[in-house]
Amino acid sequence: MASIRVADEPAFVLHSIPYKETSLILDVFTRQHGRMALIAKGAKRPHSVLRPVLQRFQPLLVSWSGKSELRTLTKSEWVGGMPSLVGDALLCGFYLNELLVKFLAREDDYERLYDRYSETINALSNLEFESKGLEEILRPFELSLLQETGYAAALDRCVETNDSPVFEALYVYQPERGVRPIQVDDPGHWPVLRGKSLLAIAAGDFSDPETLSESKQLMRFLLGLHLQDQVLTTRQILIDLKKI
């Protein structure tokens, strides 16, 4: 297999672990190549040019080479423009990273999801200036993640008829299928949503309090279906704190 070289690829660091005495193994989310495993040689050395750059939640341009699954980072440049995450916003950032690591296979490109992630991190980094709360910021990302990875069906069409939901009618989200009108014998744990909420969620509009509440129920259900018994540490903390 020929060695591959990639230059100046937009990326975010999701996670890093020490490797040998002076290096790091990075899990990075890139725009055109998806999740990549990169070794940053010498990044732990006190005077390494990489050390101050390889920070989570900061937009980077990274370059790498190699032909194995673990490529070698050859350059990393901080793009800038985003304040550091603090407080609840920092917890939410770790939550997003946990989701990406659990949901995304390596080296599958998700350009739209990358853009959504970048937008979400930017909104979290400017939380004090945002008119939206944490849940309004997080819900669109969760939905994008589920739909881009194939774990959520369309919300603006009924699975059996392909009709649009009726505003005041009630619907359930049936696992493995999608949205359909509610029935009396439906399991009680399936999410119940108004047609109005389904259409708003599909359009990315979470401004209505009832829609936001119903979207929370739906996202927890769909994420839980995929994660099953896996507990994401930051996600559980945010749930316990009633932040998401």
Curated annotation (Swiss-Prot):
Gene Ontology annotations for the cellular component aspect, listed alphabetically: bacterial nucleoid
Highest taxon in the source lineage: Bacteria
Keyword list, A-Z: DNA damage, DNA recombination, DNA repair
Keyword Transport tagged: no
One GO BP annotation of this record: double-strand break repair
Keyword DNA repair: yes
A Pfam family assignment: RecO_N
Function noted in UniProt: Involved in DNA repair and RecF pathway recombination.
Family as reported in the entry's similarity comment: Belongs to the RecO family.
HAMAP family registered for this protein in UniProt: RecO
Protein name: DNA repair protein RecO
Organism: Polynucleobacter asymbioticus (strain DSM 18221 / CIP 109841 / QLW-P1DMWA-1) (Polynucleobacter necessarius subsp. asymbioticus)
